[in-house]
């Protein structure tokens, strides 16, 4: 199976400009291709990861990736299917975010070895000294207004209003393709399905200005079985930066993927062969309650994004938090991340309360009688260890890193005391 057929088999091809010509080129030649990343935040996220992994698949097949940071377009903002205009960022912010994109991409793409080693460039390099007059004469004249407003990405904003700044974005992105072709013989652009209009502006400019054929592959919007955009947890993006989304949180996200989506996501987000995924699917369907597909997803993606050690730590954290282990084996940060949904109560470090008084003061038990019953019946745990002494008083050894203590009532009801 050639790389183009594999991308299709994995559900990674939504639209292409000329499928036959593209498939032939990817089979016979080393194709130089690019993906643009506008620095709109200080980290890439799960939505970006689909494209990053697609870039990696093509590089592994012998093709040459160019990662284009939108140092110029990031100052403008892409209007595609946005309800309102993006807020403009400062040059300093865009420059800082651009640097972070590079460091994150280096985890996945090979920037060091071989003829097809990855390269990174910035479209600010060619826009910085391009005058407005030159832009209109050399680029703008190749686009009619009719052509530009026919794009679905622009149509969706016509009634609510779109500034000329954002309206011109598609021409800027089109010019990126032209420049990359002239500088590096780039002939293929990858992007999300919402980018089709901007991307074909590039193939149009390449045809008109250089009499060359450019190719486009758009990746489908990744949705779950209900049609919702995939990649968020409780409305929050899953970031690739460990400081924004911890490896543990990412691990839990994949572990909780719906059964109906698990095999599909294995094809999209892992480098397991399609044959291996078929075997996993067979075992998964035979015993869904064991959640094999989700466990493999969590292992593969967390290891890929954060490394094997971070994955193993996430597993350990999960087992200790929910399997009744000794919480003192974990650091305070891991505990707070894993139990962020649990009620937190702040108490003075020198507060000298018996366990019974503590259970009442933080609302774990409604009365002394109930507190005594819970302790006597073995329902109260401190940092995962059962405590049955009615006169027990917390000591410094119960304070993990002098920051917190976890009290659990029963199997799942956790309370976090902070100092």
Curated annotation (Swiss-Prot):
Entry EC number(s): 6.1.1.1
Presence of keyword Aminoacyl-tRNA synthetase: yes
Pfam families on file: SYY_C-terminal (PF22421), tRNA-synt_1b (PF00579)
Residues given in the record as ATP binding sites: 232
GO molecular function: ATP binding; RNA binding; tyrosine-tRNA ligase activity
GO cellular component terms, semicolon-separated: cytosol
Residues in coiled coil: none
One GO term of the biological process aspect: tyrosyl-tRNA aminoacylation
Residue window of motif 'HIGH' region: 39-48
Positions that bind L-tyrosine: 34, 169, 173
Domain S4 RNA-binding: 353-419
CDD domains: S4 (cd00165), TyrRS_core (cd00805)
Keywords attached to this entry: Aminoacyl-tRNA synthetase, ATP-binding, Cytoplasm, Ligase, Nucleotide-binding, Protein biosynthesis, RNA-binding
Family designation: Belongs to the class-I aminoacyl-tRNA synthetase family. TyrS type 1 subfamily.
PANTHER family with a match to the protein in the record: TYROSINE--TRNA LIGASE, MITOCHONDRIAL, TYROSYL-TRNA SYNTHETASE
Protein name as catalogued: Tyrosine--tRNA ligase
Organism annotation: Lactococcus lactis subsp. cremoris (strain MG1363)
Gene: tyrS
């Amino acid at each position: 199976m050639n790389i183009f057929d594999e991308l299709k088999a994995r559900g990674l091809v939504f639209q292409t400009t000329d499928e036959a010509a593209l498939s032939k080129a990817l089979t016979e030649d080393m194709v130089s291709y690019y993906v643009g990343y506008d620095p709109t935040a200080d980290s890439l996220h799960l939505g970006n990861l689909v494209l990053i992994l697609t870039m990696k698949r093509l590089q592994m097949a012998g093709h040459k990736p160019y990662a284009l940071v939108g140092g110029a377009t990031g100052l403008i903002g892409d209007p595609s299917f946005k309800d309102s205009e993006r807020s403009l960022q400062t040059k300093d912010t865009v420059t800082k975010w651009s640097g972070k994109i590079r460091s994150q991409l280096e985890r996945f793409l090979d920037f060091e070895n071989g003829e097809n080693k990855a390269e990174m460039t910035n479209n600010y390099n060619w826009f910085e000294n391009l005058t407005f007059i030159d832009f209109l004469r050399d680029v703008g004249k190749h686009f009619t207004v009719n052509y530009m407003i026919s794009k679905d990405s622009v149509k969706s904003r016509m009634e609510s209003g779109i500034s000329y700044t954002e309206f011109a974005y598609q021409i800027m992105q089109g010019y990126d393709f032209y420049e990359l072709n002239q500088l590096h013989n780039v002939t293929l652009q990858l992007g999300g399905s919402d980018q089709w209009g901007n991307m074909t502006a590039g193939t149009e400019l390449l045809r008109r200005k250089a009499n060359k054929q450019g190719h486009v592959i758009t990746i489908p919007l990744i949705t779950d079985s209900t049609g919702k955009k995939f990649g968020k947890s409780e409305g929050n993006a899953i970031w690739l930066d460990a400081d924004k989304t911890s490896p543990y949180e990412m691990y839990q996200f994949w572990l909780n993927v719906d059964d109906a989506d698990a095999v599909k996501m294995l094809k999209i987000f892992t480098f397991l062969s399609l044959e291996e995924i078929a075997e996993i699917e067979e075992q998964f369907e035979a015993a869904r309650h064991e959640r094999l597909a989700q466990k493999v997803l969590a292992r593969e993606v967390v290891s890929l994004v954060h490394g094997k050690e971070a994955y193993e730590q996430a597993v350990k954290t999960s087992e200790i938090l929910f399997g009744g282990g000794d919480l003192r084996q974990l650091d305070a940060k891991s505990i707070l991340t894993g139990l962020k949904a649990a009620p937190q109560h702040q108490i003075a470090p020198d507060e000298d309360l018996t366990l019974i008084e503590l259970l009442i003061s933080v609302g774990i038990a409604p009365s002394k009688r109930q507190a005594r019953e819970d302790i006597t019946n073995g329902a109260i745990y401190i940092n995962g260890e059962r405590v049955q002494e009615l006169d027990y008083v917390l000591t410094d050894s119960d304070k993990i890193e002098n920051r917190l203590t976890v009290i659990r009532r029963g199997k799942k009801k956790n309370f976090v005391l902070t100092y």
